[in-house]
Amino acid sequence: MRRKIYDQLLDWKENRSHKEALLIDGARRVGKSWIVEEFARREYESYILIDFSQASKTILDLFQTYRGKWDDFFLHLQLEAGVKLKAGRSLIVFDEIQKFPQAREAIKYLVQDGRYSYIETGSLMSINENVKDINIPSEEHRINLFPMDFEEFLWALGDDMMMDYVRDCFGKRQPLGQSLHRKMMDYLRLYMIVGGMPQAVAEWVESRDLDRVDSAKRNILSLYRNDIRKYAHGLEAKVTKIFDTIPSQLQRHEKKFKLSALGKGTRGRNVETAFFWLDESRVVNPCFSATEPTVGLEMKLDESSRKLYMADTGLLISLAFSEAAIKADELYRKLMHDKLDVNKGMLVENLVAQMLRAAGHKLYFFSSYSKTDARERMEVDFLIPKLTIGSRHNIHPIEVKSSTRYTLTSLSRFVEKYRNAVAEPIVLHTGDVKVEDGVIYLPLYMGGLL
C-alpha cells in the first residue's frame, strides 16, 4: 500500500543516512515492518532484516561477542542471514528494536563505522525497562508512523484524484458542490468504520466484507491486550481498565477522562505510569487541556485534565461494539447510512483527533467551568497553532460537529474572551465549505489538511 512516510524514508536516505539511523516509532500493526522492507527492496542493492521478536540466540550473541569488532560482526551476520552486504549500498533493519536494547545501543558505533545504513522500528521506546541499562544513541532520527490517513485510505481504494481536488478547494475556501461532497462524506464514513490499520484496509479492498474487516480489527485488539499482559509489568490491571473504558469515557458529554471510572480511591499518581505506558504503545492519542490559547500550548498544559482517544477510529468502533450477538456487517451498514442510534459525536471527534495527529499536531483542548457565571462555561474540542506565527491571533479553536443541526455557544464565548489571542475559529461539520461571520466551516474530511 502507498504510504506517505515513504517520502520521509527517501529524504533520510538522501540527507541523513550517513550520520544517523532512522527510528520509526508506531503502534503494532500500523505497517512499520512492511513499509521498511518495501523501501529496502526498492532503494538498496541488498538488506538484512533482524526481527528481534523472533531472532535466534546466535544472532543476538553477535552483539555481545563482536561488539567493537565490526569486521567480524558483519562477516558473521552475513553468514547467518545468507545475504551479502555492500558498503554504501546495503541496509540493515532492526525490527522490534525495543525487545533487544543492546542492539539499539550499538547503533552509535554502527553508524560511526559508516559502511551501511540502519533503520530501527518499534514501540514502547521510552518505557524504563527498554532503556534503563543502555545509553540511548544520539545518532537516531526519529519519526512516527500512524494508521493510514484518509488520503492513504483513498489511494488503497484506487482513488488518486479526489484529495487533490479537495486540497484545492480547501486552499481556496471553495465548496465542492453537492455531488462531490456527498461522495467524499460516503468515503469518510467508510474510512471511519474500516479505520486505517493496514490489515483491515487490505481486507476491505480484497473482500468488501465488513464481517471480515471487523474480524481483522478484533485480532488487532486482542494483540494489544496480549501486549498489555506481557509487557505492562505491574501495570496490567490499570492499563487494561483504562484501555477498556475509552469508549465509555468518550461517550460522556465532556469526554474528559474521569479517574473515578477506574475504581474507588484511584489517584492520578497511581495511574500516571499506566497512562504513559498506553501513550508509548501508540494505541491511544492523549489530548490535554491547555489553560490559555497562546503560542507554546505545551507550556499551558494541564496534565491532570485529559481526553483519551483511540489511535484508530475503526478500532474504537470494534472496541465499543463488542457484543458477540451483533453482526458486524449489519451494524456497519447501519452506521454507513446513518441509521443507527449511537453517539456519532464521539466517533467523529475521535476521527478528527486521528486526522490531526497524522497531520503532525499534538492534541490540546480548552475547558472552563463556573458555577456562578455562565459566560465562563465553555469547552473547545481542539486547539492548533497557525502555520505562520505572528505577534497575536496564533491559535485556531476547532469545534467538531457530527450533525447538521448545532449551536456554537461555547465557541462564541471562547472567541469573545480570547479575541486578541485566537485566529479564525474553525468548525468541522458534515456540510460543505463556507465562511460566515468570521467562522471557517469545513467538511470533516478536510480535518487532515489543517
Residue ranges and their predicted role:
Residues 32:
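Conserved lysine of the Walker
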Residues 93, 117-123, 144, 153:
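Structural recognition of the conserved hydrophobic beta-strand(s) that form the central parallel beta-sheet
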Residues 54-88:
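Short glycine-rich substrate-engagement loop in P-loop NTPases that contacts/grips substrate
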Residues 24:
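Hydrophobic anchor at the beta1->P-loop junction of P-loop NTPases
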Residues 109, 126-142, 154-159:
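Short regulatory helix/loop adjacent to the ATP-binding pocket of P-loop NTPases
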Residues 1-16:
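Pre-Walker A adenine-sensing motif
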Residues 13-20, 29, 38, 42-45, ...:
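A cross-kingdom feature that marks ATP-driven nucleic-acid transaction machinery
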Residues 158-348, 354, 362, 368:
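Interdomain hinge/linker elements that couple catalytic modules in large macromolecular machines
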